[in-house]
UniProtKB/Swiss-Prot annotation:
Binding, ATP: G30, P31, N32, G33, Y34, G35, K36, T37
InterPro entries given in the database record: DNA-binding_RecF (IPR001238), DNA-binding_RecF_CS (IPR018078), P-loop_NTPase (IPR027417), RecF/RecN/SMC_N (IPR003395), RecF_2 (IPR042174)
Main location: cytoplasm
Keywords: ATP-binding, Cytoplasm, DNA damage, DNA repair, DNA replication, DNA-binding, Nucleotide-binding, SOS response
BP GO terms, sorted: DNA replication; DNA synthesis involved in DNA repair; double-strand break repair; SOS response
Keyword flag Phosphoprotein: no
Homology family: Belongs to the RecF family.
Localisation: Cytoplasm
GO CC terms in record: cytoplasm
SUPFAM superfamilies, sorted: P-loop containing nucleoside triphosphate hydrolases (SSF52540)
Protein's UniProt name: DNA replication and repair protein RecF
Known role: The RecF protein is involved in DNA metabolism; it is required for DNA replication and normal SOS inducibility. RecF binds preferentially to single-stranded, linear DNA. It also seems to bind ATP.
DNA damage in keyword set: yes
Length: 385
């Protein structure tokens, strides 16, 4: 798989650009702040319908405009597929597949399969559980696009149920007991959709675990062994069983946990149980990586998580596109060499670098130089001829 064409209109710093890309390695070169990462971000958005840098879509739209468009042509096994994504302010985003409108933007998920390496990856080890949940969900969606709808529906249920929990004090004051019947309905919906999401995550962690261990050993052979596990908020006594992916059983456990935490939820007005409260546990030896890993170990583990994702996508069928955003500048010589070796088999590698010296020696790559120019509308990124 490779991206043959990338077109942007009013996306971040790019007013208008059309890039013809090729299999093999391409390096986008330019000083920091010139818009290199925005190209990678656009491709990642086409992969997951989300940015790796921000949680909302508004910052993706160029200042002074009301919409951004990302257009890609992806070649997979000799077949071309065109995707256009329109990100708009104040209205629902739209998508087209091979020039035809689709009902939902989720319908284009899976056309482009990519793995992203970025400086933000350090947050997978040292950041909040939300960073690790997003890593799992993004990978699950790339592998099984239907998970995007599962997550979207679960998030809708959590929003509705949270609003209901916040309304309980007023309902009690009015003597309205019907709110508790409604809450039971939303409990069932949370358990149903939450169980499906948890099952997908646990199944994914089971497959990732041996790949993470192998990749970490390659990156840090002198370090302790790496392991991962899934911790569910419904398991008040400890981590969930890693083989437990039965949806009915998971739903029953979620309902039981909701009942057990009902008083606390009513007091605080928030949902305390569900996959939005879960975490991916990372360990080095018998210690949690967060708080105990050195800077080098943390980077090795972060890269190992991405390499493991890359390997799973390869096993699924077809080489995913590798997106490397300034990651070589963050790694020492040994880890840089290990990542470069892993990338050698990829059909397409798209890399950003502030200076060419950040690219591994001996890499044969096309170079695209990025600059910034200004006009009456402000500064914008451009590709130098």
């Amino acid at each position: 798989m490779y991206v043959r064409h990338l077109g942007l209109r009013d996306f971040r710093s790019w007013a208008c650009v059309d890039l013809e890309l090729h299999p093999g390695r391409t390096v986008f070169v330019g000083p920091n702040g010139y818009g290199k990462t925005n190209l990678i971000e656009a491709l990642w958005y086409s992969t997951t319908l989300g940015s790796h840098r921000v949680s909302a879509d508004l910052p993706l739209i160029r200042v002074g405009t009301d919409r951004a468009v990302i257009s890609t042509i992806v070649v997979n096994d000799g077949r071309e597929c065109a995707v256009d994504l329109e990100i708009a302010t104040g209205r629902v985003n739209k998508a087209r597949l091979n020039r035809s409108s689709v009902r939902s933007t989720r319908d284009v998920v899976g056309v482009l399969r990519a793995v992203l390496f970025a400086p933000e990856d350090l947050g997978l080890v040292r950041g909040d559980p939300a960073d690790r949940r997003r890593y799992l969900d993004d990978l699950a969606i790339v592998r099984r696009p239907a998970i995007a709808a599962v997550r979207a529906e679960y998030e809708r249920v959590v929003r509705q149920r949270t609003a209901l929990l916040k309304s309980v004090p007023g309902a009690r004051y009015r003597g309205d007991r019907g709110v508790f019947d409604t809450l039971e309905v939303w409990d069932s919906r949370l358990a149903e959709h939450g169980a499906e999401l948890v099952a997908a995550r646990i199944d994914l962690v089971n497959q990732l675990a041996p790949e993470v261990k192998k990749a970490y050993q390659l990156l840090a052979p002198e370090s302790r062994s790496a392991s991962i596990g899934y911790r569910a908020s419904m398991d008040v006594t400890g981590p969930s069983e890693q083989s437990d992916t039965d949806r009915q059983l998971l739903a029953a456990r979620l309902l039981a946990a909701l009942a057990a935490r009902r008083d606390a939820e009513l007091e605080r007005g928030v949902c305390l149980v569900g996959p939005h409260r879960d975490d991916l546990i990372l360990r080095l030896g018998d210690q949690p990586a967060k708080g105990f890993a050195s800077h080098g170990e943390a980077w090795s583990l972060a890269v190992a998580l991405r390499l493991a994702a890359y390997q799973l996508l390869r096993v699924d069928g077809g080489e995913p596109v590798l997106l490397l955003d300034d990651v070589f500048a963050e790694l020492d010589v040994m880890r840089r060499r290990a990542l470069a070796t892993a990338a050698e088999s990829a059909e397409q590698v798209l890399v950003t670098a502030a200076v060419l010296e950040d690219i591994p020696a001996g890499w044969d790559a096309r170079r695209v130089h990025i600059d910034v120019r200004a006009d009456d509308t402000g500064s914008m990124s451009v590709v130098l001829p």
